[in-house]
Amino acid sequence: MKQYKILFFIADGLGDRPVRKLQGKTPLEYVDKPNIRELLKNSIIGLMDPISPGVVAGSDTSHLSMFGLDPHKYYRGRGAFEAIGAGARLKASDVAFRGNFATVNNEFIVVDRRAGRKIEEADDLVKELNEKIGEIDGVKVRFYHGTEHRVAVVLSGKGLTDKVSDTDPHEVNKKVLESKPLDNSPESQFTANIINKLTRKIYEILNSSEINKIRVSKGELPANIILLRGAAEFVELPQFESYTKLKAAAVSATALIKGICEQIGMRVVTPPGATGGLDTNYLGKADAAVELLKEYDFVFLHLKATDAASHDGNVDGKVYAINKMDEMIGRILDKLGSELVIAISGDHTTPVEVKEHTGDPVPFLLYVPYDIINDVVNDFNEREARRGSLRIRGLDVINLLLNYSNRAEKYGA
C-alpha cells in the first residue's frame, strides 16, 4: 500500500461554547471555512477528549497525550518544556520554571499578570537579570525569554527538587505568593527558600531598571517581577521516531510546544514573523510546513493565536484567527495538493467568554486522500462534530494517523 505523509494541525484552545456576540454560535461555527469544508468529502470527524472526558487539559499534558505519551506517566511539570523551547539546554537534576513578566505595586500586589502582554524590551530585561544575578546560595540561575511576556527560569545545583509551590497567585489584586515546600524533604525547603530569595532579587533589579523607568514614562506598565509556576525537573522522554517510525518535524513559535517537540526528537522550525500571537505570520507558518513535508513523514503545525484570543476574551480575535487557519489549510493544499493525511483539531477548549480552559471535548477532523466511508456533515465545528463517528482520546490520535497513512503495524499474529 502507498504510504502517505501526515499533517497534524492544532489550533490551540480551538474548542468553544455558544457566544452571545455571535448570536449563539461558536467562533468555529461562525466562520466560513471553504478550504476545510472541502476536506469533508473524504473525512471522518468527531470529538476528542485530550486526556479523558471532563478533564481540564493543560497545553502540556494535552500535547503529550496527542503525541502518544500518557501524561499520567510522563508529565512532571511544564517548566522544563518552556525552558527547552526558549533555548535552554537542560541536564538531569536541573529544575525549570515557567514564568510571566508581570506588574506589582510596592506591596507585591499583582496589578497585571502579563505587564501588558507585549513587552518589546523583554530580551533586554532578561539580559539584565542574567548579568546581575548569576547565582543564589550556590545555585546557578539562568533566565530565557520565550514569547511576549513569557519567561523560563532554570536552577542548576545540588539539593534541588521540583516539589515546591508557585509564586504566581493566578489573579490580579492578589499578593505574590511565597513558594512553599510540597513535602518534608530538606531539598524542598532549600528550593523554596531559593525561589523566595530569587523573587525578591528579581523585583529589586527590575523595579529599578532604566528599561522599566522608560516604560513608565511612556505610560506603559513596568515589567517589575517574574511570577513563577510549573516547577519541573528535567527527565528524558521517549523519542517520537522510536515509537512511531515517523521522521517528524514541527512548526511553532510557542516555547512550551517547541520544548515538547524538541524533547521528543522533532526538528522544530519557527518562521520569521511567527510570534505566538494574533499578529503571527500565518502563511509563513503554512509555507514552512509545506517545505518540511517534502522531507519529513509527519509535520506538526501549531497555531497559538486562537488560544491567545480566548484567554483575552477577544471574540473578534478568535474569529480572525480561525479565518487565518482556513487560509493556512488552503495554502498547504494549493502547494502540495491533497495527497496527504490531514488531522485538524484543538488541544483543549478555551471558551472565549470563560477565558480559561474547560473540560469540554474538542472537534477533530481526519482527512484521507482515498475513498473511505466518510461522515456526512456540513461543516467542521463543535455542533457538527457531535454528528460524526469519532469519540476519541488524545492518546488515540497517533494510532489513527498511522492507520490511515498506511503505516500501522499489526498488533498480534
UniProtKB/Swiss-Prot annotation:
The UniProt record lists the keyword Isomerase: yes
Gene3D superfamilies, per database record: Alkaline Phosphatase, subunit A, Metalloenzyme domain
Coiled coil ranges: none
Enzyme's top EC category: isomerase
Q: Which UniProt key words apply to this protein?
A: Glycolysis, Isomerase
Q: Which InterPro entries match?
A: Alkaline_phosphatase_core_sf, ApgAM_prokaryotes, Metalloenzyme, Pglycerate_mutase_ApgM, Pglycerate_mutase_ApgM_sf
Q: Which reaction does it catalyse?
A: (2R)-2-phosphoglycerate = (2R)-3-phosphoglycerate
Q: What is its EC number?
A: 5.4.2.12
Q: Which domain of life is it from?
A: Archaea
Pathway listed for it? Carbohydrate degradation; glycolysis; pyruvate from D-glyceraldehyde 3-phosphate: step 3/5
One GO BP annotation is: glycolytic process
Gene Ontology molecular-function annotations? metal ion binding; phosphoglycerate mutase activity
Which family is it part of?
Belongs to the BPG-independent phosphoglycerate mutase family. A-PGAM subfamily.
Extract the PANTHER family matched here: COFACTOR-INDEPENDENT PHOSPHOGLYCERATE MUTASE (PTHR31209), METALLOENZYME DOMAIN-CONTAINING PROTEIN (PTHR31209:SF0)
Q: What is this protein called?
A: 2,3-bisphosphoglycerate-independent phosphoglycerate mutase
Q: Which organism is it from?
A: Sulfurisphaera tokodaii (strain DSM 16993 / JCM 10545 / NBRC 100140 / 7)
